[in-house]
Design a protein with these regions (language model features):
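A short, exposed loop/beta-hairpin motif centered on an aromatic-Gly-Thr core
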Residues: 72-86
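Non-catalytic tandem-repeat scaffold regions and their flanking low-complexity/translocation tails
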Residues: 40, 100-101, 114-115
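Short amphipathic beta-strand and strand-loop transition segments with alternating hydrophobic
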Residues: 30, 52-60
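A short, charged, amphipathic alpha-helix used as a generic interaction element across diverse proteins
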Residues: 82-100
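Short, mixed-charge low-complexity intrinsically disordered segments
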Residues: 104-127
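Short aromatic-glycine-(Arg/Gly/Cys) micro-motifs in beta-strand/loop hairpins
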Residues: 58-75
Length: 127
């Protein structure tokens, strides 16, 4: 990670759904890097717009709330930082839609099994 100025990222959370700024979001991937760690944040805005971006935390900064953000691209977004039910329901809705769309184009048995497995994971997950 190259040295850059660290800035606060309003949507980064401590994993409890809200941070000290009252911002929403879900950090779902944490990667160790040389100078600290990187977290990839996924989520939805109130209007349903999805977002995804990386947050870098430096071990050398004086507080854990000094973050550096990089603009990310919208990908497969599966969490909405309101309630566990909302999050799981949104994941399930997206998987169901994906399954329906793919079934129209004659998906393979492997793909169907993978989607069923994803839905089962969501049902059992403590998101």
């Amino acid at each position: 990670m190259k040295k850059e100025k660290f800035v606060k990222v309003m949507r980064a959370t401590d994993g409890n759904g809200l941070n000290q700024y009252g911002a929403k979001g879900n950090v779902i991937m944490k990667t160790e890097i040389d100078e600290g760690y990187k977290e990839t944040v996924f989520g939805f805005e109130e209007d349903g717009t999805g977002y995804e971006y990386d947050v870098y935390y430096s071990k050398t900064t004086d507080t854990k709330y000094k973050w550096q953000a990089t603009e990310g691209s919208t990908g497969l977004l599966i969490c909405f930082g309101k309630t566990q039910a909302t999050c799981a329901d949104e994941v399930m809705r997206r998987l169901e839609r994906m399954h329906k769309v793919l079934s129209y184009i004659n998906i393979s048995a492997n793909m169907a099994n993978m989607l069923d497995h994803c839905k089962e994971l969501v049902r059992n997950a403590k998101i």
